[in-house]
Swiss-Prot record:
Name of the featured protein: Cathelicidin antimicrobial peptide
Entry comment, domain topic: The cathelin-like domain (CLD), which is the propeptide part, does not seem to exhibit auto-inhibitory function, as it does not inhibit the antibacterial activity of antibacterial peptide LL-37.
Alphabetically ordered keywords of this record: Antibiotic, Antimicrobial, Cleavage on pair of basic residues, Disulfide bond, Immunity, Innate immunity, Secreted, Signal
Top-level taxon in the UniProt lineage: Eukaryota
Known function: Antimicrobial protein that is an integral component of the innate immune system. Binds to bacterial lipopolysaccharides (LPS). Acts via neutrophil N-formyl peptide receptors to enhance the release of CXCL2. Postsecretory processing generates multiple cathelicidin antimicrobial peptides with various lengths which act as a topical antimicrobial defense in sweat on skin. The unprocessed precursor form, cathelicidin antimicrobial peptide, inhibits the growth of Gram-negative E.coli and E.aerogenes with efficiencies comparable to that of the mature peptide LL-37 (in vitro).
Gene that encodes the chain: CAMP
Post-translational modification: Proteolytically cleaved by proteinase PRTN3 into antibacterial peptide LL-37. Proteolytically cleaved by cathepsin CTSG and neutrophil elastase ELANE.
Keyword Cytoplasm appears in the UniProt entry: no
InterPro entries the record matches: Cathelicidin-like, Cathelicidin_CS, Cathlecidin_C, Cystatin_sf
Amino acid sequence: MKTQRDGPSLGRWSLVLLLLGLVMPLAIVAQVLSYQEAVLRAIEGINQRSSDANLYRLLDLDPRPTMDGDPDTPKPVSFTVKETVCPRTTQKSPEDCDFKEDGLVKRCVGTVTLNQARDSFDISCDKDNRRFARLGKFFRKVKKKIGGGLKKIGQKIKDFLGNLVPRTAS
């Protein structure tokens, strides 16, 4: 008659299960992407779906919003990409490509998940018109400063000419 000592002991199975329990959470944690890694993956997807001739590369990443800890919950993202000199057909990573001088700049918004296994994103990109808005703001400031300066100069000339008029003694 066999006893428990002849087969695998309960202690060994407990040890194996304990080790598996310790290893599994590490494997799950390793699959969670950082905010920036998730955005870079989304840019890879944008480049694959794009009909433009060249790859796009991250130009500016807006600050990470406060988020919950669930990697499966879609996280809001917003960033700017710029056209590079590398053609879409290249095997290079966009990060290895230089930005194209006067390349197209796109503003992208949407959501990404940080769970590497799900690897989902919903991003839309439009031509970035913010730089033109900033240019308009710059010209308004210049106009205001020049206008104010001209008024001061005009007032000083008026005062100077007013002092040149001979005064009559009464």
